[in-house]
């Protein structure tokens, strides 16, 4: 059994509204990390990013910044080089704590090595992530994805996949559990949609260390409100 932190995903269109700030405050005890999604912005806006981070600094929570590309289920309509450039700019922003870096087998490993090392040199924790919104690959492929990602030595390995049957959920949980036993990286495994909700609430049973929830509208299929998620995760830790 591992301890599971709760990340609350927010995706503001502009600066944070008073309503959202109030909602974060009300639910602060259920949150360990604020995941700030910025791929919904028309273009990367460093000034706006700094303003939003400044707003979030009133809370004593870690800040994870994520730019999710459309290839992996987000709204960021950018090509590979544009995405890598955005990551490079984010790494030079010192105000937050964690950065999400998408992993893809199509990108040369040298590019990832450079980004991960630069981020870590700047004091950022790296969440190396891979998302498949179409299906759940076979168990061996899930394990191999974790294996290839861990070679980059990030702080977190995150794998999120879409299940089509109960066996898909079980395969994701097994891959997460097996990987957790053989790596020093923190593991995250998410089986999306309602079918896979057990992966969100029982992360710790299978070696997972981070579960993503929402404060307003879910930002991914199957996301649970953070207050409910915290309660459910805690049930397994008692």
Curated annotation (Swiss-Prot):
<comment type="pathway">
    <text>Metabolic intermediate biosynthesis; chorismate biosynthesis; chorismate from D-erythrose 4-phosphate and phosphoenolpyruvate: step 3/7.</text>
</comment>
<dbReference type="GO" id="GO:0009423">
    <property type="term" value="P:chorismate biosynthetic process"/>
</dbReference>
<comment type="subunit">
    <text>Homodimer.</text>
</comment>
<keyword id="KW-0057">Aromatic amino acid biosynthesis</keyword>
<feature type="active site" description="Proton donor/acceptor">
    <location>
        <position position="131"/>
    </location>
</feature>
<dbReference type="GO" id="GO:0008652">
    <property type="term" value="P:amino acid biosynthetic process"/>
</dbReference>
<dbReference type="GO" id="GO:0003855">
    <property type="term" value="F:3-dehydroquinate dehydratase activity"/>
</dbReference>
<keyword id="KW-0704">Schiff base</keyword>
<dbReference type="GO" id="GO:0009073">
    <property type="term" value="P:aromatic amino acid family biosynthetic process"/>
</dbReference>
<keyword id="KW-0456">Lyase</keyword>
<feature type="binding site">
    <location>
        <begin position="35"/>
        <end position="37"/>
    </location>
    <ligand>
        <name>3-dehydroquinate</name>
    </ligand>
</feature>
<dbReference type="InterPro" id="IPR050146">
    <property type="entry name" value="Type-I_3-dehydroquinase"/>
</dbReference>
<feature type="binding site">
    <location>
        <position position="223"/>
    </location>
    <ligand>
        <name>3-dehydroquinate</name>
    </ligand>
</feature>
<dbReference type="GO" id="GO:0046279">
    <property type="term" value="P:3,4-dihydroxybenzoate biosynthetic process"/>
</dbReference>
<dbReference type="InterPro" id="IPR013785">
    <property type="entry name" value="Aldolase_TIM"/>
</dbReference>
<feature type="binding site">
    <location>
        <position position="200"/>
    </location>
    <ligand>
        <name>3-dehydroquinate</name>
    </ligand>
</feature>
<protein>
    <recommendedName>
        <fullName>3-dehydroquinate dehydratase</fullName>
        <ecNumber>4.2.1.10</ecNumber>
    </recommendedName>
</protein>
<keyword id="KW-0028">Amino-acid biosynthesis</keyword>
<comment type="function">
    <text>Involved in the third step of the chorismate pathway, which leads to the biosynthesis of aromatic amino acids. Catalyzes the cis-dehydration of 3-dehydroquinate (DHQ) and introduces the first double bond of the aromatic ring to yield 3-dehydroshikimate.</text>
</comment>
<dbReference type="InterPro" id="IPR001381">
    <property type="entry name" value="DHquinase_I"/>
</dbReference>
<dbReference type="Pfam" id="PF01487">
    <property type="entry name" value="DHquinase_I"/>
</dbReference>
<feature type="active site" description="Schiff-base intermediate with substrate">
    <location>
        <position position="158"/>
    </location>
</feature>
<comment type="similarity">
    <text>Belongs to the type-I 3-dehydroquinase family.</text>
</comment>
<feature type="binding site">
    <location>
        <position position="68"/>
    </location>
    <ligand>
        <name>3-dehydroquinate</name>
    </ligand>
</feature>
